[in-house]
């Protein structure tokens, strides 16, 4: 497996042969300019590192077998990023990345090292989406597909964690946060029957009793 490193100041377009056996590492290290994926091609690569500059994702599916790191600009192009590795994959970098669709297809989990947002859909095919102490932003129209007691958003279980923040439009809404800790799945459902203005709800499960607990057995 080799690496393709994009430098310079102009715009560049790169096409990956879908029949290629080896998946490369893509590194974007540009002072100015954008690296664009072929819009009609589904990519399968080992890793994507945006150290500097911009990367335009394919409008189809970007399959990643290793890590994603963004310290520049990632333009999702309404495409899907599928994490399909066999060891834990990370989403890191210094930029807060906005994804359109994410397919969590890694039994060893996907782990957040930086805050990120999902605009359209988070699909659980395999494994958990581990946010650690980071924040996951979900947009007004974001949906979550195929979550379960073994496939869910996992927080660090501490009150210092930032949790999951979901935006809601004015009006009614019904949404389930498929969230929990490493030890327990504790989904939360909100049925909003009246909402006069747009807003957001933040959920962070905590392992342990609430400090105001008055029942000795912590059964409430």
Predicted regions and their residues:
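Extracellular beta-sheet-rich ligand-binding/adhesion modules
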Residues: 1-220
